[in-house]
């Protein structure tokens, strides 16, 4: 599949680096953003983090580094769905309050509902225009959104549906798509 659990540079266009669950993505993104600045390139580096992933110390070291080096060409999107493989993030090791932590590390912070295309569009445009600090977009989301039996279920972390579940999921998603296209 083009969309694996951990997207691969081999199969997923636009993915420049594969990282695991240890918070390595934001560190790599810092390196890419710094490299762009040193080379005089004018582009943004985007990285996506899970709210469970930000329990890792490496994430906060990178957050501190990004601000210290003035990496205003870096945008980190935190998928805040409150679920990870073992349960809710609050039950496992709460990173809350997420926005306040990024602010304390000197970041520009935007908080949105990821289910709103308008909010996503506005946040990405604001992040692209913002100068002076790295930007964190804290995107409140629903894990498995649009598939009734997957929504808010940590048991679907890294699990593939069987044939029957796949058909049911696709029916629900296609119904949502049809509804969106009608509006």
Predicted regions and their residues:
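Short acidic, glycine/serine/threonine-rich loops at helix termini
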Residues: 8, 58-60, 86-90, 147-152
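Conserved thiamine diphosphate
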Residues: 40-43, 90-123, 174-182
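Generic beta-sheet signal
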Residues: 43-47, 74, 133-139
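A short alpha/beta connector and helix-capping loop motif
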Residues: 56-81, 136-138
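Glycine/aspartate-rich loop-and-adjacent alpha/beta segment that forms the canonical ThDP
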Residues: 117-183
């Amino acid at each position: 599949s083009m969309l694996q659990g951990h997207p691969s540079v081999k199969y997923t266009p636009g993915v420049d680096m594969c990282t695991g669950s240890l918070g390595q993505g934001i560190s790599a993104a810092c390196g890419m953003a710094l490299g762009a600045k040193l080379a005089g390139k004018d582009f943004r580096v985007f990285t996506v983090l899970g709210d469970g992933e930000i329990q890792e110390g490496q994430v906060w070291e990178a957050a501190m580094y990004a601000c210290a080096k003035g990496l205003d060409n870096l945008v980190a999107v935190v998928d805040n769905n409150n679920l990870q493989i073992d349960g809710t993030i609050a039950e496992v090791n709460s990173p809350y309050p997420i926005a306040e932590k990024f602010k304390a590390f000197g970041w520009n912070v935007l908080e949105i509902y990821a289910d709103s295309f308008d909010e996503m569009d506005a946040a990405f445009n604001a992040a692209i225009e913002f100068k002076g600090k790295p930007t964190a977009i804290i995107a409140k989301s629903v894990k498995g959104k649009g598939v009734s039996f997957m929504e808010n279920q940590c048991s679907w972390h890294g699990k593939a549906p069987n044939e029957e579940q796949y058909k049911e999921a696709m029916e629900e998603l296609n119904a949502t798509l049809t509804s969106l296209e009608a509006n």
